[in-house]
A protein has these predicted regions:
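Short, surface-exposed ligand- or partner-binding patches at beta-edge/loop junctions that are enriched
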Residues: 61-62
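Rhodanese-like catalytic fold shared by cysteine-dependent sulfurtransferases
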Residues: 1-19, 23-57, 66-103
């Protein structure tokens, strides 16, 4: 698993086909989500992740990057190869002057 900065994520979103997954709780997502992300709460990851393509590029994020790092390790243990964690989560994303969108 590779840890990436908000700037690196912004570049990946513009250039590559990646799967961006917000693993925060429902009440946290009400504040906004990174455009292009899907919301899969961490509590559902163990059920959802095994059905996904392990060869795709996956970026996980949460509030500050702790929960998403745990999800990245789960993905790695399932054989996923291209896993990224947004260091600092949405806090770092917003502090870097990137926006969240409302669902």
């Amino acid at each position: 698993m590779e840890h990436i900065t908000p700037q690196e994520l912004s570049t990946l979103l513009r250039k590559n086909k990646i799967n961006l997954v917000d693993v925060r709780k429902d009440h946290e997502v009400k504040q906004g989500i990174i455009e292009g992300a899907i919301h899969i709460p961490m509590s559902l990851v163990n059920e959802w992740l095994p059905a996904q393509n392990i060869d795709n590029h996956w970026v996980f994020y949460c509030h500050v990057g702790v929960r998403s790092a745990k999800v990245g390790l789960i993905a790695k243990n399932l054989g996923f190869k291209n896993i990224y964690n947004l260091s600092g989560g949405v806090v770092a994303w917003c502090q870097s002057d990137f926006e969240l969108i409302k669902l």
